[in-house]
Swiss-Prot record:
Heptamer of 7 subunits arranged in a ring. Interacts with the chaperonin GroEL. The lineage of its organism: Bacteria, Bacillati, Bacillota, Bacilli, Bacillales. Keywords: Chaperone, Cytoplasm. PROSITE patterns: CHAPERONINS_CPN10 (PS00681). GO terms for biological process: chaperone cofactor-dependent protein refolding. The keyword Cytoplasm applies. One of its GO terms (cellular component) is cytoplasm. This is Co-chaperonin GroES. Belongs to the GroES chaperonin family. Pfam families: Cpn10.
Length: 93
């Protein structure tokens, strides 16, 4: 498994629907980049004023993140995104 460092988080992307509400099938080129994912690994935390502070997200959280944030990586056939905690906008549910 990928173990992120510091304030980084590894997420597995949640793919968007392949068809519209009216039943039109969207080609890959028409789909927007996903902005939702599931946290699969969390770094050790960030350092502020010499103190280590734990991240606000944890493994299993569903999150929304900035549209162009992070670095895409493929590991053991699965696509992941590694991003910093400050690129996370919200935790869902």
């Amino acid at each position: 498994m990928i173990k992120p460092l510091g304030d980084r988080v590894v997420i597995e992307l949640v793919e968007q629907e392949e068809t519209t509400a009216s039943g039109i099938v969207l080609p890959d080129s028409a789909k927007e980049k996903p902005q939702e994912g599931k946290v699969v690994a969390v770094g050790s935390g960030r350092v502020e004023n010499g103190e280590k502070i734990a991240l606000e997200v944890s493994e299993g959280d569903r999150i929304i993140f900035s549209k162009f944030a992070g670095t895409e990586v493929k590991y053991e056939g699965t696509e992941y995104l590694i991003l910093r905690e400050n690129d996370i906008l919200a935790i869902i549910g």
